[in-house]
Amino acid sequence: ESGQGSINASVLMEGTFETPIYAGHASIKSGSLRLASIQEEIEDIQARLDISGRTVQISEGNARIGNGTVRLGGGIILIQDAPSQTNLQATFSSVRLRPNEDLDLTASGTLNLMGRVGSLELVGDVELLNLHYTSNIELDDMLRKKAKPLPLPGLSPGEAWSLRVNVRGENNLLFTNN
């Protein structure tokens, strides 16, 4: 995993360490990010974060993944001695993802991540413009009872994610296997 780009930030902290108040902004220009979880590089990252009091607002956020585009917006409220409150939106168009060699998909849609950290909800609509899955499906492996449940990374006891995402794909899903 790696990233690059030009980062400019100006942040002022007032008050005490127990009750700090922040003001300022941060921006990223000509950024790029490579994640181990997807083959595509996230490019042309342009973002501006405005910080006021205990609120971080994304006033501008754009990137390109493959030939597709992503727009980000929303904000986070930093709550003292409590989980932060999140309301983030992503709108994406013709984004191609290849999370592994067996799956290639292109999608458009809108996703919102809302709630307090530890109890987040992902809501939205995703249209699969095309999906091609090429891995062999072994029914014995799928139906065999697992000895223990699969672990969920990033969640502590008592934390949860709620998912309400509508996924639609009409006449463009291709499964090549067995």
Locate predicted features.
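Membrane-proximal interfacial segments on either side of biological membranes
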Residues: 1-57, 73-178
